[in-house]
Each structure stands twice: as structure tokens, then as C-alpha cells.
């Protein structure tokens, strides 16, 4: 029997790319992994099972969207990942008014599960529920299913709370967590939410990608 979200494929997907990439030294979205830009790889991965086109939350002067709709933050000042989530909520309310929720993924985590949206949607029981991914005992709220209905509360909180800790905002709402197991590879278990922050991480990601390709 379908849950509150009857068809996870109809959840609008958003790439969060509003970070500064300071530890990488260059824009992470355009570094190459396996001969393919991260932007291309991640947009393709999240879009595989979604019927609604992927949108990109990034700065207005983003150099190349690769055809994705560009949705800059509705509140300027680089207020963190939740500013991108708010932007996605506002965009969804305008362009996909049928959708109760949207899904976000960051631009720097290339190995997240293909069925991410379906798994996050499973525990959702109401229009105000949030669902976030977890793995190895850690929360990954940037991999989240977010209700459009809490946009006003999120905007008020972003403008009022100078610390803007994600966990503090989540504490205001009903949050359901979905734990994802590690991925078995030829060189050991891989955290599905491994992210690329530094050049060394990119080197490791190439090793994981090669291992995944060798794994039966």
C-alpha cells in the first residue's frame, strides 16, 4: 500500500551547489571523476528515477548549468545549506504545486543510493514530515526529503538564528531518519554518502569508483 508520498518518482530533485569549495581550491562541481564532471554525474544519478527535471541551486553567476534550471538562493549571503533547501521549497511551491516534498542532494557525493528518494519517502506519514539519510551513525541532512509546508518557518529561522545549525532547525520538526548500509566493494566497505571536499578525497573517490566497477 502506498505511503503518504504515493509516487516517489514525482518528488522534485535539487542539487545543492551553493558552497564555497574552499578546501578543494576549485569549484567541485567541475572536477572530473571517472572522466565525467561531478555536476553531470550527480545530476544523472539523482535524475534516473525522477520524472521531474533536476534543478540546480547555485550562485546566479554559475558558469555552466549544463541545461539544468538555475535557482539561486532566495536569501543572499551564503547562509548555509538550509538556504538552498529553502530556495528549493520556494521553487517547488511555484513550479510543482502538486508536490508536498522535494529531495536535495549535494554536488560532492557521487555514490549515494540510486533508490535514495524511494527509501526516504517510505517513512513519511504527513505533509510536514522531514526525512534525512544516515549512515555509520552519522546524519546527512543534505540528503533529505523536505516538506514545502515548512518554508515560512525555515525562512524565519534562517533570518533569526545567527548560528544556523542544521540540527537546531531539525529539532523544531518531526524528522524521520533512514539508515543506509555501506556498499561492499573490492577494496572494502564504502560509505554511500562519502563526499569530496579536498583533492585527496577526489583521489580516494577514483579508487572507490574503480573498485565499484570491479565488484560483481
Curated annotation (Swiss-Prot):
Its cofactor is Mg(2+). Its main location: cytoplasm. GO terms for biological process: bis(molybdopterin guanine dinucleotide)molybdenum biosynthetic process. GO terms for cellular component: cytoplasm. GTP binds at residues 16-18, 28, 57, 73, 108. Mg(2+) binds at residue 108. It comes from the Bacteria. The keyword Nucleotide-binding applies. Pfam families: NTP_transf_3. The keyword Cytoplasm applies. Its EC number is 2.7.7.77. Keywords: Cytoplasm, GTP-binding, Magnesium, Metal-binding, Molybdenum cofactor biosynthesis, Nucleotide-binding, Transferase. Belongs to the MobA family. The N-terminal domain determines nucleotide recognition and specific binding, while the C-terminal domain determines the specific binding to the target protein. Transfers a GMP moiety from GTP to Mo-molybdopterin (Mo-MPT) cofactor (Moco or molybdenum cofactor) to form Mo-molybdopterin guanine dinucleotide (Mo-MGD) cofactor. This is Molybdenum cofactor guanylyltransferase. It comes from Rhizobium rhizogenes (strain K84 / ATCC BAA-868).
Amino acid at each position: 500500500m502506498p505511503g503518504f508520498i504515493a509516487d516517489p518518482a514525482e518528488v522534485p530533485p535539487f542539487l545543492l551547489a551553493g558552497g564555497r569549495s574552499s578546501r578543494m581550491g576549485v569549484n567541485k562541481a567541475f572536477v572530473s571523476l571517472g572522466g565525467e564532471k561531478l555536476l553531470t554525474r550527480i545530476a544523472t544519478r539523482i535524475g534516473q528515477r525522477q520524472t521531474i527535471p533536476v534543478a540546480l541551486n547555485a550562485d546566479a553567476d554559475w558558469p555552466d548549468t549544463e541545461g539544468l534550471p538555475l535557482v539561486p538562493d532566495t536569501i543572499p549571503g551564503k547562509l548555509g545549506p538550509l538556504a538552498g533547501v529553502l530556495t528549493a521549497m520556494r521553487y517547488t511551491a511555484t513550479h510543482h504545486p502538486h508536490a508536498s516534498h522535494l529531495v536535495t542532494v549535494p554536488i560532492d557525493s557521487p555514490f549515494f543510493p540510486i533508490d535514495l528518494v524511494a527509501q526516504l519517502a517510505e517513512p513519511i506519514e504527513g505533509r510536514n514530515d522531514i526525512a534525512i539519510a544516515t549512515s555509520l551513525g552519522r546524519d546527512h541532512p543534505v540528503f533529505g526529503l523536505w516538506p514545502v509546508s515548512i518554508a515560512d518557518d525555515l525562512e524565519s529561522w534562517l533570518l533569526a538564528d545567527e548560528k544556523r545549525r542544521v540540527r537546531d532547525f531539525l529539532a523544531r520538526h518531526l524528522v524521520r531518519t533512514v539508515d543506509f548500509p555501506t556498499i561492499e566493494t573490492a577494496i572494502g566497505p564504502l560509505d554511500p554518502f562519502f563526499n569530496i571536499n579536498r583533492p585527496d578525497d577526489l583521489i580516494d573517490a577514483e579508487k572507490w569508483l574503480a573498485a565499484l566497477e570491479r565488484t560483481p
